[in-house]
């Protein structure tokens, strides 16, 4: 084997069905343009860095075994707008630590119990008192023994009740000592003991119940609700809550969970000699705590404050399963999750120059895939990893079994990424989309895409730590207010990338011009640069002077408000944009190249430049565009609207007056007259018909005689011829 070769475990479930001896190892994937290239159990060669596996020949027929595992579908990792921050922060930064402590203090300030023990109530009868030595009784007298029979309810309600035995009377603020009177008698310093106990048990104030019906995490959701996604608010089974419970579960399992700065501040499970708080509920008595601190948390320490929140947010953990994860990962997750909310709320989302760090997609992809491949739980479920050919580029992917176990596998992956949020967030992670031929699986952390987007407070240039194969990247973080609109964001960033390219090319020689293109795999842009230093200096000068940025932004906004796609998006009143440019000063294929500076050879590291956030009022610009538009043509009326309205009224009245108008009563009377006339005509018609019938009956006889006479005369005339004949 050549130098740099290594052996890795096979991460696929056997060879493809169409594999033949000497054939291609690339596996076609339905729904994805390209193939899957799995790792091989015997790699014939790889790069020195191990970043890309090498294609290998197929094994002989004797090595081919039947596929025993279920079919797995490749899922590539995609970071959409809501899953990514273009800049991230340093966990050890003093300002970050201060904001985290401030955030948690604001949540728990009404629930913290002071270390005062001068008003504690000990329920001891005469026999119990006799068992105590004189020095102990004297110390109890110094604390203050209160007789319930001689005290009113108001006085008793503000006390912590210390009981040495559990009887039928349980007060909401009861501390029970399992060791009994003997334990109390053995204490060398009663007052100091209880002061220490109360210090390391952050409970509610004395005048309220010590049992948490609502945890501090619920208070955080209420106080900082706008920083959480709408479906996250009020829920308990999300990222932060589950991680805090995992922390207490580890402590309950005996794992050391401590502040990395103050290692003696640890959470541990209660021992039989520790006091246990009880509360009287509808269904009996409940333990409000299973955990205690080995030492009081250090004030103004953000991680100690996070441990306080974990303790006060814990419930009964008897039902929980084993948590197999290092507590440092969980502590990092809880701390950075709270820090993101704290920076967004108190820091207005802006990071100071010293607190700014670069982000990197490729690093996060590698971390997620490595976490999945090393997870024994996911391996048992059949989840593996592989390389997938997408658009002629090999990408690392997660292979998830398709079938009944699919949703179980996705849930397990979601849980793993939630627990490792702290590590991933160090590089900008806020969530991920797993894309397969069957669709998209969205894994979110519950943080709001608008209110938790971090930006730089000032423009800065720093070293870019990256594992990317791309040399030059342009990223933008665009937020629309008051409603986030994907169409406006996509259109504006496309227009801005075009204007950005024009401004750069206008400032450099023709041979140094760049061509900015949209990445086919994510929301970023990339470009090639023949002279990276020249391009980088030009961009830095653009940001420094501001003139080119003004022109670039102005033209992009003008085209945005007049775009047919966005002109109907009237719900967007303003837009905010941050730009980051990441560049390698040396091309990735020629990293040995050096630059001579002041007579010395010096390797330039990859750099990134981030701008502050620019905010533009779209509503005012939209109004101005509408006023200046050619479609906006005011019409000057010869008459006012009031005058025209009066003319319309007069026109109608004139038209009605020109007709023979009659009232409703006149119309009724006319109708009645017509009816009467009709009835009279009908009556006359009936009379005429009757008279005509009688006349016909009287004239019957005369008519017959007349007819006879006429017939006779005719016959006579016919019998006697006239003279002429």
UniProtKB/Swiss-Prot annotation:
Q: Where is the composition biased (Basic and acidic residues)?
A: 675-686
Q: Please give the positions of the paired cysteines in each disulfide bond.
A: none
Q: Where is the composition biased (Polar residues)?
A: 7-16
Q: Where is this region: Disordered?
A: 1-26, 666-725
Source domain of life is Viruses
Biased amino acid composition, Acidic residues: 687-709
Name listed for the protein in its UniProt record: Non-structural protein 4
Which source organism?
Rice gall dwarf virus (RGDV)
């Amino acid at each position: 084997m050549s130098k740099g070769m290594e052996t890795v475990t096979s991460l696929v479930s056997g060879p493809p069905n169409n594999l033949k001896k000497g054939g291609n190892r690339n596996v076609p994937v339905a729904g994805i343009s390209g193939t899957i290239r799995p790792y091989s159990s015997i790699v014939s060669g790889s790069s020195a860095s191990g970043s890309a596996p090498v294609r290998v020949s197929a094994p002989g027929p004797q090595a081919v075994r039947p596929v025993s595992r279920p079919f797995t579908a490749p899922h590539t990792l995609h970071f959409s707008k809501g899953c990514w921050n273009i800049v991230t922060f340093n966990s050890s930064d003093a300002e970050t630590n201060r904001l985290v402590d401030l955030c948690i203090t604001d949540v728990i300030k009404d629930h913290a119990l002071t270390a005062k023990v001068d008003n504690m109530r000990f329920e001891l009868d005469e026999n119990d008192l006799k068992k105590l030595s004189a020095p102990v009784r004297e110390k109890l007298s110094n604390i203050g023994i209160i007789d319930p029979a001689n005290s009113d309810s108001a006085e008793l309600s503000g006390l912590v009740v210390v009981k040495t035995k559990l009887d039928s009377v349980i007060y909401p603020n009861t501390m029970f000592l399992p060791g009994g009177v003997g334990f109390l008698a053995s204490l060398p310093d009663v007052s100091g003991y209880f002061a220490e106990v109360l210090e390391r048990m952050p409970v509610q104030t004395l005048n309220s119940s010590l049992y948490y019906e609502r945890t501090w995490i619920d208070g955080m959701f209420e106080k900082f609700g706008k920083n959480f996604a709408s479906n996250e608010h009020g829920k308990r089974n999300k990222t932060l809550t589950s991680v805090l419970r995992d922390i207490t579960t580890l402590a309950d399992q005996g794992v050391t969970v401590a502040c990395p700065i103050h290692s003696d501040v640890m959470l541990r499970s209660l021992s039989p000699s520790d006091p246990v708080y009880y509360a009287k509920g509808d269904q009996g008595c409940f333990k409000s705590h299973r955990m205690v601190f080995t030492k009081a948390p250090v004030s103004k320490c953000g991680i100690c404050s996070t441990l306080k929140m974990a303790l006060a947010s814990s419930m009964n953990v008897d039902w929980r399963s084993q948590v197999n994860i290092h507590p440092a990962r969980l502590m990092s997750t809880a701390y950075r999750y709270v820090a993101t909310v704290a920076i967004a709320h108190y820091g207005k989302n802006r990071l100071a120059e010293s607190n700014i760090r670069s982000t990197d997609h490729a690093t996060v992809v590698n971390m997620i895939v490595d976490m999945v491949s090393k997870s024994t739980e996911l391996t048992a479920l059949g989840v593996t990893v592989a390389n997938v050919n997408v658009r002629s580029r090999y990408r690392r992917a997660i292979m998830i079994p398709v079938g009944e176990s699919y949703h179980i596998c996705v849930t397990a992956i979601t849980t793993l990424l939630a627990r490792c949020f702290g590590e991933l967030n160090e590089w900008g992670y806020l969530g991920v989309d797993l894309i397969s031929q069957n669709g998209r699986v969205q894994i979110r952390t519950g943080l709001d895409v608008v209110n938790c987007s971090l930006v730089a407070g000032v423009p800065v240039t720093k070293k870019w730590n990256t594992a990317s194969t791309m040399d030059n990247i342009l990223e933008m973080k665009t937020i629309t207010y008051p409603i986030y609109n994907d169409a406006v964001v996509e259109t504006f960033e496309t227009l801005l990338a075009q204007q950005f390219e024009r401004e750069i090319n206008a400032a450099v020689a023709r041979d140094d011009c760049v061509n900015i293109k949209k990445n086919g795999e994510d929301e970023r842009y990339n470009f090639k640069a023949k002279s990276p230093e020249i391009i980088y200096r030009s961009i830095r000068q653009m940001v420094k002077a501001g003139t080119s940025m003004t022109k670039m932004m102005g033209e992009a906004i003008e085209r945005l408000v007049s775009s047919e796609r966005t002109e109907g998006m009237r719900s967007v009143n303003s837009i905010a944009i941050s730009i980051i440019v990441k560049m390698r000063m040396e091309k990735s294929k020629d990293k040995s190249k050096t630059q001579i500076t002041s007579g010395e050879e010096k390797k330039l590291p990859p750099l990134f430049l981030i701008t502050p956030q620019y905010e533009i009022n779209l509503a005012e610009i939209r109004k101005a565009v509408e006023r200046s538009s050619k479609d906006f043509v005011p019409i000057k009326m010869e008459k006012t609207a009031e005058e025209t309205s009066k003319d319309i009224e007069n026109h109608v009245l004139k038209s009605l007056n020109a007709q023979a108008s009659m009232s409703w009563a006149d119309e009724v009377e006319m109708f009645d007259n017509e009816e009467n006339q009709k009835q009279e005509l009908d009556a006359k018609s009936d009379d005429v018909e009757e008279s005509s019938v009688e006349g016909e009956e009287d004239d019957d006889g005369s008519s017959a005689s007349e007819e006879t006479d006429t017939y006779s005369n005719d016959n006579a005339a016919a019998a006697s011829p006239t003279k002429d004949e």
